Amino acid sequence: MIQNSDSATATLLPRKKERASGPVSVLAIGSANPPNVFHQSLFPDFYFNITQSNHMAEVKAKFTRMCAKSGIKKRRMHINEDILEAHPSIRSYHDNSLDVRQDMLVEEVPKLGKVAADNAIAEWGQPKSNITHLIFCTSSGIDMPGADWALMKLLGLRPTVNRVMVYQQGCFAGCTVLRIAKDLAENNKGSRILVVCSELTLISFRGPTEDHPENLVGQALFGDGAAALIVGADPIPHAENASFEIHWARSSVVPDSDDAVTGNIKENGLVLHLSKTIPDLIGQNIHTLLKDALEEMFDACNPSSFNDLFWVIHPGGPAILDAVEEELNLKSERTHASREILSQYGNMVSPGVLFVLDYMRKRSVDERLSTTGEGLEWGVMLGFGPGLTVETLILKSVPTQAFKYF
């Protein structure tokens, strides 16, 4: 009972929202990319031509070597020659260009997210009115109201949809949004959550400078893309089609790694600092992170069983994938999905790991494997990014006989 100022009494009502019964499932996945394709072997010439930097011969030679070793064959980007010619401040390293970038990003990031969301909703096969929550994630531009609001308008979602906007989390955020969606779905019976990650390199594209060699790493790796998922518990029989279950999720910060990955919004856009120590930091800590996850999930951690799990790893770059593979003694096929997405799209920041998840389930069906997780039952999803933050999820696959994609 509560006593108010007028000495009247009121009764607290019991909590009415029920928890879900079963585990949270991925019910659909959609993706999208801009139309402009850049082949990695040709990108150094394009990059140094468009930024008028061919006089920096040694820097160009270094960049060419970086692109050759990137594990990337091609990338998709919103930017093209026409955009960069029309807005020369973007292609300069030092010019003030934040306003120009922002004006484009606040329009284009939600638009690309909408294409991915439309694809996910089409696969899901249920009316948009059944969406109860929207989570939107981007590190590309900031505005109020945010990209979540813009996407709600573009999709024609109900104005009462519960929205969560996740800004500036970087490469690990594809896992973060699934951790948030898991908590929402578990605690709100019948909820259906639309999760969208959309990123454009327009926020960080700029010409080379000898003062910031790390800038070249980002220019060699990053690509544009959007991914969308429908997430919910207790799939409706014969109406919804689960491809994975999310059973455990946690966020961790690697010790003594504060400056390994940082991004700062400046007048010339998002300036990234990517340390050479990132792969070593991940390699040195991956055993501890996985031990905690697997012990809590399975009451035991057997390092020899790592190859009995499927691996959905953020395709951040070949050195990161090499570090995980080597430290865990993984067979090369365990990182195939991540390397394939890196090869075809580059590092798309938050959507990248979700592209890996989509690729894995479709390949598993196409190759007639027994489960959506490459024929294996349990798997690990890993995201790495600023902090140095590591997101870890434990997933369970479903039998491919029970899963269909169109």
UniProtKB/Swiss-Prot annotation:
Catalytic activity from the UniProt record:
3-methylbutanoyl-CoA + 3 malonyl-CoA + 3 H(+) = phlorisovalerophenone + 3 CO2 + 4 CoA
Record keywords: Acyltransferase, Transferase
UniProt xrefs under Pfam families: Chal_sti_synt_C, Chal_sti_synt_N
Q: SUPFAM superfamilies given for it?
A: Thiolase-like
User: How would you classify this enzyme at the top EC level?
Assistant: transferase
Looking up InterPro entries in the UniProt record yields: Chalcone/stilbene_synt_C, Chalcone/stilbene_synt_N, Chalcone/stilbene_synthase_AS, Polyketide_synthase_type-III, Thiolase-like
Instruction: Tell me the GO molecular function terms.
Output: phloroisovalerophenone synthase activity
Q: What is its EC number?
A: 2.3.1.156
Q: Which GO terms describe its biological process?
A: polyketide biosynthetic process
Active-site residues from the entry: 171
Q: What does this protein do?
A: Produces 3-methyl-1-(2,4,6-trihydroxyphenyl)butan-1-one (phloroisovalerophenone).
Protein family membership: Belongs to the thiolase-like superfamily. Chalcone/stilbene synthases family.
Q: What is this protein called?
A: Phloroisovalerophenone synthase
Annotated organism of origin: Psilotum nudum (Whisk fern)
